Amino acid sequence: MSVVVRHDWDRKELQALFDLPFPELLHRAASVHRAHFDPAQVQVSTLLSVKTGGCPEDCAYCPQAQRYDTGVSAQKLMETEEVVAKARQAKAAGASRFCMGAAWRSPKERDIPKVAAMIREVKAMGLETCATLGMLDAGQARALKDAGLDYYNHNLDTAPDYYDSIIHTRQYQDRLNTLEHVRDVGLKTCCGGIVGMGETREHRVGLLLALATLPAHPDSVPINQLVQVPGTPLHGTQQLDPFEFVRMIAVARIAMPKSMVRLSAGREAMSDELQALCFLAGANSIFYGEKLLTTGNPDTERDQALFQRLGLRPMQITVDAAEHDHPGTVHAEITRSAACEHAA
């Protein structure tokens, strides 16, 4: 099956995909997925909060916003040695990518060298590296790239016409500007959004339209299901229909056929059957480990058991650290399945 990568999608086309009968939509999405990926392989990442809480922004979904009483206290930036220890544990559990998140509006200049040191050390272990630190300027993006960062995550969160219902302290254009800085220095982009925040299907179409018409499709597209945290404004929002979540995955796969589509936040509350439908619809990446920043995530044993039941295996990668300013050269290939790592 030949699939053309397009950047000229229009709203009517994506809306028509969303409105297809569910079996037909899954068939189309699975066909596109198979044209570009091995459907039995899933990329496995681990996400660590290296700086938790105290964020000055007002994102209505976020327990790390200091203005909400969520029980999350502000903590200082972790030491590099602590981060390396967590990365070592993640690799032993089968992760191939290690993501570092900090609850900042944007990093201060004094923080960039500290994060760069974390990136260099994790990269030298043979892991892909990803960071999500808030808004970046061009110089900060360059510094992270020079440290060896592979991916930068900066989500659009929701559709442009629903954005003001969720966030007031950062403009949509601010997010687009950060993505531009990241692309300009050659970093891979990780960009998606959150569903289940009270938006309509039309808003979900709008989010995917914004993503699929970027100058370059994100290399990774995380689709998050809202995790409702007491104390945040969105706590108590009506739950999204699980089939609607699968539709979101399927249309993302069709619209961005070469991107990794990641099951991100909210997976802890998903049944194995729902996750299996998401993999069938084209999801091929998950976060692995008991926490996503400050919210829960399925434990590794559950994920390993699910992979075994579905016949899935972690995606193999090769990380070359020689292209960066590291002492020595690292060629690492993650080849053992998570189940084997657990058995060992």
Swiss-Prot record:
One of its GO terms (molecular function) is biotin synthase activity. Its cofactor is [4Fe-4S] cluster; [2Fe-2S] cluster. It is an enzyme of class 2 (transferase). SUPFAM superfamilies: Radical SAM enzymes. [2Fe-2S] cluster binds at residues 99, 130, 190, 262. The keyword Ribonucleoprotein does not apply. One of its GO terms (biological process) is biotin biosynthetic process. [4Fe-4S] cluster binds at residues 55, 59, 62. It holds the Pfam family Radical_SAM. Binds 1 [4Fe-4S] cluster. The cluster is coordinated with 3 cysteines and an exchangeable S-adenosyl-L-methionine. Keywords: 2Fe-2S, 4Fe-4S, Biotin biosynthesis, Iron, Iron-sulfur, Metal-binding, S-adenosyl-L-methionine, Transferase. It catalyses: (4R,5S)-dethiobiotin + (sulfur carrier)-SH + 2 reduced [2Fe-2S]-[ferredoxin] + 2 S-adenosyl-L-methionine = (sulfur carrier)-H + biotin + 2 5'-deoxyadenosine + 2 L-methionine + 2 oxidized [2Fe-2S]-[ferredoxin]. Its EC number is 2.8.1.6. InterPro entries: Aldolase_TIM, BATS_dom, Biotin_synth/BioAB, Biotin_synthase, Elp3/MiaA/NifB-like_rSAM, rSAM. Catalyzes the conversion of dethiobiotin (DTB) to biotin by the insertion of a sulfur atom into dethiobiotin via a radical-based mechanism. PANTHER family: BIOTIN SYNTHASE (PTHR22976), BIOTIN SYNTHASE, MITOCHONDRIAL (PTHR22976:SF2). Homodimer. This is Biotin synthase. It comes from Xanthomonas euvesicatoria pv. vesicatoria (strain 85-10) (Xanthomonas campestris pv. vesicatoria). The gene is bioB.
